[in-house]
């Protein structure tokens, strides 16, 4: 690495006015970069989660995260998510929402106790975020991963009707 030249791309993004920015997944990098750039004002239940579908995110919003990780199971191929096996960290799938948590569950506590705690924590975080969304004029939902314009439009349309 010593002496290696790295090329960085810069992008001209339009300036926008926003009252609130929140992560809606799909992996850890959104929450990481929001925090790194001092833009992560509130912790989102979707921070650090792996999820593939905006439809699931909307359904969680609509249900106030009521069933979030209450029906869950250990992922058998955990190494695919966390690389080298970790004796403490457990990879857990929310069976109801097809979402994967790689940072919240540990081997030294039973799954049911942890899932109830994660659900309670997520619901408390969601109340704060929901209040902030409702009191904001301009909200930015940030997400990493594959982008489909039609799916994103539908998500934003549904969220705008919800709030």
Please state what every model-predicted region is.
Residues 2-163:
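Extracellular glycan-modifying ectodomains
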């Amino acid at each position: 690495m010593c002496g290696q030249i790295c090329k960085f791309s810069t992008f001209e993004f339009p300036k926008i006015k926003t009252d609130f920015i929140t992560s809606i997944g799909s992996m850890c990098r959104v929450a990481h970069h929001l925090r790194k750039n001092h833009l992560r004002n509130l912790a989102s239940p979707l921070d650090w989660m792996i999820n593939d579908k905006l439809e699931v995110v909307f359904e969680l919003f609509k249900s106030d995260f009521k069933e979030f990780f209450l029906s869950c199971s250990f992922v058998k191929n955990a190494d695919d998510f966390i690389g080298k096996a970790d004796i403490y960290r457990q990879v857990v799938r929310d069976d109801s929402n097809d979402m994967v948590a790689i940072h919240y569950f540990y081997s030294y506590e039973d799954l049911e106790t942890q899932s109830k705690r994660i659900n309670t924590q997520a619901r408390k975080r969601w109340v704060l975020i929901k209040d902030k969304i409702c009191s904001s004029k301009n909200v930015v939902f940030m997400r990493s991963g594959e982008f489909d314009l039609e799916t994103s439009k539908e998500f934003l349309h549904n969220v705008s009707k919800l709030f």
